[in-house]
Amino acid sequence: MTRLTLALDVMGGDFGPSVTVPAALQALNSNSQLTLLLVGNPDAITPLLAKADFEQRSRLQIIPAQSVIASDVRPSQAIRASRGSSMRVALELVKEGRAQACVSAGNTGALMGLAKLLLKPLEGIERPALVTVLPHQQKGKTVVLDLGANVDCDSTMLVQFAIMGSVLAEEVVEIPNPRVALLNIGEEEVKGLDSIRDASAVLKTIPSINYIGYLEANELLTGKTDVLVCDGFTGNVTLKTMEGVVRMFLSLLKSQGEGKKRSWWLLLLKRWLQKSLTRRFSHLNPDQYNGACLLGLRGTVIKSHGAANQRAFAVAIEQAVQAVQRQVPQRIAARLESVYPAGFELLDGGKSGTLR
């Protein structure tokens, strides 16, 4: 394994360094080839490194940043005032080649805008998309995008997302000839928005995409598709609804419950069922798949949940490691070159793709 250097925006997210710094130490313990650049306020970071041993400290470097982009600031305002912020400095480290990827739990819109500004989209990609890999009931995985980077998406963007998601499923998740579906309100051809129907028509003409049609939201965790494509608004609502239901379900399994006194054998049976079911469904725990990759850029950027705990942020760091090792941006670029002649005409010097 080759050595990797990642830039962490340790000030971003709901909990800042209190979560991100311990998660960084956890990631270093798991990967001896990893070096981390901790971007943020040194006064907030240094005390949290007290438990780090000499070997860990040799693979850590604090990169000072003057400010933090708040989560409630509009992206346009955040970008204008971003100079010296921990998020921007972390992305600049990737741009300059000092880091191979950036991980942040900060403002999603600001991260999207700054990443596009500093790292630039791949040729043929109009706008990057947030993508994650979710577990399903058949113990496999489904790639889902967009999860919030683009609220409004036209058919061109949906087709581009399908191409990128297919590459990620094949190259990173290692699913041969992955099935691709569009999230819709029904399976019938006449259902859905014009953008979805137009994207469906184009996807049917691309030989390298194994397009299977529409999928409804209630089938997200069934394993019927390997890649699910939607606009960012729909994807974000779908993901957070699913996570809320899963967390509630796992919480109920662990709950001892209140009520009248039961016999010892009923209590024993209940505890056995709790442990058995918790193990059975533990793979659905959202903490295990935290970290959405901002796909379609000339560099690797991972967006962690703002409310991520230490374990979840460490998972996001691991997502960045995998994306770099599998050379995801380079593989997407190669696939785009082979796909575009079949259904796209590149305009504006390759900065955007338009359906023809």
From Swiss-Prot:
Highest taxon of the source?
Answer: Bacteria
Predominant location category: cytoplasm
Q: Name one GO molecular function term.
A: phosphate:acyl-[acyl carrier protein] acyltransferase activity
Catalyzed reactions per annotation:
a fatty acyl-[ACP] + phosphate = an acyl phosphate + holo-[ACP]
Q: A GO term (biological process) for this protein?
A: phospholipid biosynthetic process
Checking Gene3D superfamilies in the record gives: Isopropylmalate Dehydrogenase (3.40.718.10)
Q: Which segment of the chain is annotated as a signal peptide?
A: none
Q: Keywords, A to Z?
A: Cytoplasm, Lipid biosynthesis, Lipid metabolism, Phospholipid biosynthesis, Phospholipid metabolism, Transferase
The annotated pathway is: Lipid metabolism; phospholipid metabolism
Localization recorded for this chain is: Cytoplasm
EC identifiers of the protein: 2.3.1.274
Give an example GO cellular component term for this record: cytoplasm
Per its database record, what is this protein's job?
A: Catalyzes the reversible formation of acyl-phosphate (acyl-PO(4)) from acyl-[acyl-carrier-protein] (acyl-ACP). This enzyme utilizes acyl-ACP as fatty acyl donor, but not acyl-CoA.
Question: What interactions and quaternary structure are annotated?
Answer: Homodimer. Probably interacts with PlsY.
Q: Which family does it belong to?
A: Belongs to the PlsX family.
What protein name does the entry list? Phosphate acyltransferase
In its UniProt entry, the species of origin is given as: Escherichia coli (strain 55989 / EAEC)
Q: What is the lineage of its organism?
A: Bacteria, Pseudomonadati, Pseudomonadota, Gammaproteobacteria, Enterobacterales
User: What gene makes this protein?
Assistant: plsX
